[in-house]
UniProtKB/Swiss-Prot annotation:
PANTHER family cross-referenced by the UniProt entry: ENOLASE
Similarity annotation: Belongs to the enolase family.
Protein name (Swiss-Prot/TrEMBL): Enolase
Function: Catalyzes the reversible conversion of 2-phosphoglycerate (2-PG) into phosphoenolpyruvate (PEP). It is essential for the degradation of carbohydrates via glycolysis.
The EC number(s) this enzyme carries: 4.2.1.11
Entry-linked InterPro entries: Enolase (IPR000941), Enolase-like_C_sf (IPR036849), Enolase-like_N (IPR029017), Enolase_C (IPR020810), Enolase_CS (IPR020809), Enolase_N (IPR020811)
Catalytic reactions of this protein: (2R)-2-phosphoglycerate = phosphoenolpyruvate + H2O
Keywords: Cytoplasm, Glycolysis, Lyase, Magnesium, Metal-binding, Secreted
Annotated cofactor note: Binds a second Mg(2+) ion via substrate during catalysis.
Highest taxon in the source lineage: Bacteria
Enzyme class: lyase
Cofactor or coenzyme needed: Mg(2+)
Length: 437
């Protein structure tokens, strides 16, 4: 029987050199290991990532309390349970914590256990993780959102918006789409070098040059697409998905530059302009009319519901509007957004909610209500590639996992190549069908 015999956690380091939690789960005949990511720009509504707070050790970012919680409370609570009973395991984790935001044991502790149990269950069952979670119909490789220029909280430069990404939609296979992204990445690097701009990279592997404006960043991306020999789509207002091979996705991370006291969006890193919610929505409408943008994540701040409604009403019929800080992978927040008719997509970060079951519930709720789901990494990552498996398991159709550099990002892309190979003729690359706009 696949009974949990031992659960052991340890403190390891993530891609930024900060501590994070890794968990091992043992049964008599299987083993699972999972490492937990962490974010730089975190939503205030996320589940609690438990840190030690001792400034003399890892600048207060140690996770030994979370590790101890796993090695005592969780180990004792889950021993003897069947590792294949994922929903029961996750229910027990929530009971052991007993708080609405997982502040007692830490979402980082619970997530490590939840994912490691899933991996041990998959190994016991003799299946790949995507097949174990998703069943026989799990066959869709995701369209990647590839971060090529970093700004905002992810880079020390003059760009206000956090991520400028490319999405290869004009292809019939994931491997060809990945090649396209890599070639554009290298074309952009050459373009930056030719202009005497920095090719240093940010937390997620994208370039982080000092530019004169946010507009210069997106214009460089469009130029790099052409330099690499590919065709950028038209602006969404002109039927962008109907033509071209590559579209652009943005993550401004607007909560990071929203001044709640002023109720203004303040472009602190570039030209210092201040925009109201209505002006910010109009700004994104203009960009979607001028550039081949198919997706905007967190175009408005996490609690600016009125601003989100304005933005959705303006461009939600033609641009994917992704809620990250807005929804925080939380079914309750998502249900509120659905009721208010704001956004049309959810970003899915497993550590925002803390268990696999809750993650899958959020994805299911989104799909049932016509919202897309984008499976996502965090800026602080590890070599763990579980999100690649989850993307295929849920047939989400989209994944956001960084640029074409840094092995913590490439681990996910390479795992998807292996899954595509394993699926063979069953593999589906959705291309433009990944979107509902």
């Amino acid at each position: 029987m696949p009974i949990i015999r031992k659960i052991h956690a340890r403190q390891i380091l993530d891609s930024r050199g900060n501590p994070t939690v890794e968990v091992d789960v043992y049964t008599e005949s299987s083993f699972g290991r999972a490492a937990v990511p962490s974010g730089a720009s975190t939503g205030v509504h996320e589940a609690v990532e438990l840190r030690d707070g001792d400034a003399s050790v890892y600048l207060g970012k140690g996770v030994l309390k979370a590790v101890e919680n796993v090695n005592t409370i969780v180990d004792e609570g889950l021993r003897g349970m069947l590792v294949t009973e994922q929903e029961e395991i996750d229910r027990m984790l929530l009971e052991l914590d007993g708080t609405p935001n997982k502040s007692k044991l830490g979402a980082n502790a619970l997530l490590g256990v939840s994912l490691a149990c899933a991996k041990a269950g998959a190994e016991y069952s003799g299946m790949s993780l995507y097949r174990y979670i998703g069943g026989t119909m799990a066959n869709t490789l995701p369209v990647p959102m590839m971060n090529v220029i970093n700004g905002g909280a992810h880079a020390d430069n003059t760009v206000d918006f956090q991520e400028f990404m490319i999405m290869p939609i004009g292809f019939t296979s994931y491997s060809d789409a990945l090649r396209c992204g890599a070639e554009i990445f290298h074309a952009l690097k050459a373009l930056l070098k030719s202009r005497g701009l920095s090719t240093a990279v940010g937390d997620e592997g994208g370039f982080a040059p000092n530019l004169t404006s946010n507009e210069e960043a997106i214009e460089l991306v469009v130029e790099a697409i052409g330099k690499a020999g590919y065709k950028a789509g038209s602006p969404a207002s002109k039927g962008g998905l109907g033509e071209g091979q590559v579209m652009i996705a943005l993550d401004p991370a607007s909560s990071e530059f929203y001044d709640a006291d002023k109720k203004k969006y303040v472009f602190k890193k570039s030209d210092k302009r201040e925009l109201s919610s209505e002006e910010m929505a109009a700004y994104w409408e203009k960009w979607s009319n001028d550039y081949p943008i198919i997706s905007i994540e967190d175009g408005m701040a996490e609690d600016d519901w009125a601003g989100w409604k304005m933005l959705t009403d303006r461009i939600g019929s033609r641009v994917q509007l992704v809620g990250d800080d807005l929804f925080v992978t939380n079914s309750v927040r998502l249900a509120e957004g659905i009721e208010k008719k704001v956004g049309n997509s959810i970003l899915v970060k497993v550590n925002q909610i803390g268990t696999l079951t809750e993650t899958l519930e959020a994805i299911d709720l989104a799909k049932r209500n016509g919202y897309t789901a984008v499976i996502s990494h965090r800026s602080g990552e590890t070599e763990d590639s579980t999100i690649a498996q989850i993307a295929v398991a849920t047939n989400a159709g989209q994944i956001k996992t960084g640029s074409m550099s840094r092995s913590d990002r490439m681990a996910k892309y390479n795992e998807l190549l292996r899954i595509e190979e394993e699926l063979g003729a069953q593999a589906v690359y959705p291309a433009a069908k990944a979107f509902r706009v």
